Amino acid sequence: MEVKISESAFNTRVEKLQGALNTHKDAFGGADSVLLLIGKGGDDNPYIKTAVAQNWLLGYEFFSTALLVTPKRVIFVTNSSKAVHLEGLKKDDKVEVWVRPKEGGKEVMEKLAKVAKEAGNKLGVVVKDKFRGPIVDEFEAALKDSGIEKVDIEVGLSHLLEAKDDDEIKSIRVASRASTAYLTKFFTDQMLGIVDEERRLSHSKFSEQIENKLQDEGFFAQNQVKLGSDFHQTNLEWCYMPIIQSGGKYDLRPSAVSDDANLHGGTIVCTLGTRYKGYCSNVGRTFMINPTKAQEQNYEVLVGLREKVFDSIKVGAKACDVYNAAVSYIKSKAPKLEAHLLKTIGWSIGIDFRDAKFLLNAKCQREIVDGSTFDVSLGFQNLTNSAATDPKNKTYSLALVDTVRVTRAGVAVLTDSAPVALSEVTYFFEDDDEDAEKEKKKKEQAKKEKKQQQAAATVSSITRTKLRHEARAEDNNDQKRKDDQKALHEKLNKAGLERFKNTEGALNGEEKVVIKKFESYKRDTQLPQNLLKDLRVHVDTRSQSIILPINGRPVPFHINTYKSGSKTDEGDYVYIRLNLSSPGQIAGSKKDAPQVFEDPDAQFLRSITFRSRHVEHMNDVFKQIQDLKKASTKKEAEKKEMEDVVAQDSLVEVRARRPLKLDAVFVRPAPDGKRVAGTLEIHQNGLRYVSPIRSDHKIDVLFDNIKHLFFQPTEGELIVCIHAHLKNPILIGKKKTWDVQFYREASDMAFDETGNRKRKYRYGDEDELEAEQEERRRRLQLDKEFKAFSEKISEASDRKVDVDTPFRELGFHGVPFRSNVLLQPSADCLVQLIDTPFSVITLGEIELAHLERVQFGLKNFDLVFVYKDFNRPVTHINSIPVDQLDAVKDWLNEVEIPYSEGPVNLNWGSIMKTVVADPQEFFTSGGWSFLDLESDDEDQEEEESEFEVSDDEPEDEDEDSEEFASEDDSEGDFDSEEESGEDWDELEKQAAAEDGEPPRKKR
């Protein structure tokens, strides 16, 4: 299911092709049937007409596949792995899928040739497309004596692909916006910086920089480029390497390439194009540095020509008429420029970048139709600038390239956000006096560099200049960061003073006294009569009580009054000592708060000892007491754990229609710990996950309870997922969780054929190439499917929930819990969504960050987040590689989080106690400024890292942190199997400590 072919689109387009065999008989060369046969992969040209047509029909390119279309039948011939993806098209009786055997498909191809012969003697193919591979050889052999004549259908396919439907137009529009963004938001800024700073950068290197920008997934978000809610970066590709030209050498053909000459600050021409979901776009502009009047006048003519051509492109107009209108305009405005006008001023563009059968030139007689799209490429080639003093400015070219859509109302320019006006593309930097001064400085610099070369001949002057520039840039960046942080710290301290100006004393104020109330029995008649006959020590598990015989009467003590106990064997007797709670006792553990009593002046029994000869009975009683105490402690811990679990409203199911579904997804945490693929549904007010095993295994997540919704793509990961981080935890099974994740694995072992029988008969790498191609397709489809579903969730919530995607390029490795993982910033959070336990830290809740163990010689440092809610424990991310220190600082500065750094680990438990005790005094005394001071008075430990495999958190914070319920740390409770409550040995030690006796050693 990794490749999903749109059945409706396929049926519509194949019917269009079948109809065209009759309506455009001449364009298809009189063909009775059409064969689209693609052999083995490996051709670098994605615009081969056969592949373009197959992509248009299926949305994908299938290698080693034949597609025969006759007026009544559609037949696929492919291998078994690809046939699986085509099975969904067989719902229509006209569509057949034949599987070509592994050992050769001679008989199948002969059968296919026979079907083609039955349709007629003329078989339509794209004659110029040449493929190789076994399937091609087998079909050619089958045609040899069949009497079938091949006819060229390239013109017919051109007619077929000319008019675009709404989905195709949408893809071209997205590609056009992306191309324009790369031109205006990246190229222009970089180009001006290079020219202004007189940096040396070749056209080819500059082109590579633009090409690599495609990998920056945060580019469009950072530059506020709107590409639609369902846009996904993995569907975006370059149509060709960006073309950059300057310095007197220009080639305005689409086949031009960027040369190795350095960018020259004169006339600069840049054209680039991206394709989205296979649909192409193109945009190009000319930028002029210190242009002459003649250059400006010629450019104004080009702008006027652009408007004239747009007016001429109309439904029903011929391509040659558009070109002739352009020539007429030039003759009337600037006759001298006619000789420099390009011979072709555009072409049909779409899934094929340049349709060679539909060009806007003097020869093409094709008529323009509604819904068509064109690449309009206007330009004057190799003009002469006689006023230029620089030889590289003597020759120049001007170009304006746009992607347009044709409608009956006129032309819609899809790249209209690119600059066109003269004032937007011309720049003036410096006059002749400044040039002379700079030339003088250059000569002085050259002398210095010559001396340096004598000392280090292996380092060129260019390299040294580059290194000095980089050093200056780095220093400037550090200084800017320091200035920003200084302002952020001042703002933080002012905000703290304002926040706590009316707060006196402790932040949490007077804690409400909680008195535990418990009762064994309401009346003495409720005492179990069967336990009262012999007046011995008994345990009533049902009422959670210990019944003790005192003065000949049974006296019940609730298990909550029992503190600890011990059992001793002496001769024929066994002694049991029971210690009970009473006022004034010191808590046995630092974690335990002293118990509060309703009437501390009442009489209490602190301890009692029983002696008995009934050893077996007393052993059973003591064990029952021990087990009951453990169960009670565990129950109390679970109750405390569940205090913040809020009862959700009921999910309102969709009734009028079927809910939107995402099938075959796994959930984490899984109900009952079982990993089974289920279905995720979108209902009126939330999501529902349904398990296929048991209908009662449902997980409901309401939109109102979703704090953050993330889409994690497959790039660099083994899964793709939709992750919901919640405002309030929910119960899944019997465990509380702040995070619910729905995921699917990105790889499929079914594609791994290494080592099977196929190796005996195939010796090339065809299988590996196909497997890699399938893997890429699968990942692309998974990203597309999950991204689209996450956007549907956002839409269903009326945008109460926005989809956030982590920026992998900003990620850094660290240890938030026990494992070293990749933490990735998103727009609002710092997250780790792949390994459990998950980490989701909301940036808006952070007070400041502190970098620990930042000192020379250490390979790692630690990052601590302090929250605005000072009662929350701080979050540690340990063992971050030191080479990512600057990147982390830049990110913190970018998201406006004040940070500080120090050489050692701090005792954050003590620090936060001080802050909470009197926050007003804390901020009055300077607030967090002490973190930047070097102090030896702090109780600090200089060690490699406070992270140890055996601990989730630093030891010095255990006692202070357990009372808090961590929210955004998402500690993944569902992975823990630890038992709550103290064990009996610990209780025995406490009892011994109270009695002044040393604890007995175990044998």
Curated annotation (Swiss-Prot):
Compositional bias of type Acidic residues: which residue ranges? Answer: 933-986
Region annotation Disordered: residue ranges?
A: 436-486, 930-1003
Name the cystine pairs.
none
* Presence of the UniProt keyword DNA repair in the record: yes
Q: Which InterPro entries match?
A: Creatin/AminoP/Spt16_N, Creatinase/aminopeptidase-like, FACT-SPT16_Nlobe, Fact-SPT16_PH, FACT_SPT16_C, FACT_SPT16_M, Pept_M24, PH-like_dom_sf
Function, please?
Answer: Component of the FACT complex, a general chromatin factor that acts to reorganize nucleosomes. The FACT complex is involved in multiple processes that require DNA as a template such as mRNA elongation, DNA replication and DNA repair. During transcription elongation the FACT complex acts as a histone chaperone that both destabilizes and restores nucleosomal structure.
Q: Self-association or partners: how does it assemble?
A: Forms a stable heterodimer with POB3. The SPT16-POB3 dimer weakly associates with multiple molecules of NHP6 to form the FACT complex.
Instruction: Write out the GO biological process terms.
Output: constitutive heterochromatin formation; DNA repair; DNA-templated DNA replication; nucleosome assembly; positive regulation of RNA polymerase II transcription preinitiation complex assembly; regulation of sister chromatid cohesion; transcription elongation by RNA polymerase II
Output the Pfam families linked to this UniProt entry: FACT-Spt16_Nlob (PF14826), Peptidase_M24 (PF00557), PH_SPT16 (PF24824), Rttp106-like_middle (PF08512), SPT16 (PF08644), SPT16_C (PF21091)
* Listed PANTHER family: CDC68 RELATED, FACT COMPLEX SUBUNIT SPT16
**What is its subcellular localisation?**
Nucleus; Chromosome
Stretches of Basic residues bias are at 440-450
Q: Which UniProt keywords apply?
A: Chromosome, Coiled coil, DNA damage, DNA repair, DNA replication, Nucleus, Transcription, Transcription regulation
Q: Which family does it belong to?
A: Belongs to the peptidase M24 family. SPT16 subfamily.
Protein known as: FACT complex subunit SPT16
Native source species: Yarrowia lipolytica (strain CLIB 122 / E 150) (Yeast)
